[in-house]
């Protein structure tokens, strides 16, 4: 097991009469890319603000690397529109007396060299995200916290961001905690999922555990679905309809359904097995 660099135990937070975090607990190990998953209003941003020391929890314990070893982008990137990308890094390097090579940072986040001396007001959102992450890297953090980083990005921007995060983890050993409600965009890079609902941590699971938890469903389309549907009901087999298909969550029922279809002279027009997507799992089990 890798070194635990962040540990939360029993974190509570209340605003007025509304409790927005309830007994939140989880650990993050060095080098992990962790997805903090939940609907808007689940408490993700509040939790991240507590981790960064921007607000205080009402109770609970946090053990982590020192604050200067945590970089972050919370909500939209805070940049100065009339400064260039290079000037941003030079400003923060001077302000905090850092010795980091700013050219190396710009190259690490793959910000195009032609944009280094261009004013940020002329940057795309994806370029602004890259620059913000370069700023977060200036103090050589062990952990970077990103709040909804894919918001507003086009598909190419999302793909580029994923590649950059993987590259930074692999090259520098940086650990990431990334919040999102766009689940499919984290599915390709996440090592661990922390699933939240209404301020509570519902589950903490590795990507391997989640993959094992995703079911494989049988999709079947015949010349007379209604007859087959009646048979499924009589046999007590769980099923539902999707478009023109009957969907059976138990793929093991395949032979039984084939035998019945042949015996009943039903023409099988299409049949396949499909693994449940994370998005579907989330919608059916969490929301």
Each language-model region and where it sits:
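Catalytic Walker B motif of ABC-type/P-loop ATPase nucleotide-binding domains
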Residues: 144-148
